[in-house]
């Protein structure tokens, strides 16, 4: 397996505020399943001049998750009707296309720093390898036969609630 990553950051200021652009790409090749993946991603951040405690963000990109050993396992029938386990060399990485919009607000209270972060996200998923659960046993299908999506809102409150200790809620 071979992989590489390249990223650059570009900052510029306008009369409205500070912009930060981040662009990157990850590439990898896995000889086991002969898969080459190319994952571009980009984000933009903005800190407005009217309130330096605010930050707005927008990001998007492709994310791939290579299969683990347990995911490669698939059940097939031999010529006698017996079920046997073998590894699927055609199984590809699961893929997600992410879009995220969010922001932060930092402030001081009681002499300590605090930050509220909120992010809305949408992820389109494909090449999924589903699984079944039987009590504590997880059995993967061993095939890229599903797709899905995830969306939501993450809100975090960070601060020094106990002096000297950073915490997240």
Regions found by a protein language model. Give the residues of each.
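Transmembrane beta-barrel strands of outer-membrane/channel proteins
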Residues: 23-27, 44, 58-62, 71, ...
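Surface-exposed extracellular loop regions of Gram-negative outer-membrane beta-barrel proteins
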Residues: 1-32, 37-45, 157-168
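Outer-membrane beta-barrel translocator domains and adjoining extracellular loop/strand segments
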Residues: 33-39, 69-75, 82-84, 128-136
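Membrane-embedded beta-barrel scaffold of Gram-negative outer-membrane proteins
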Residues: 90-151, 166-167
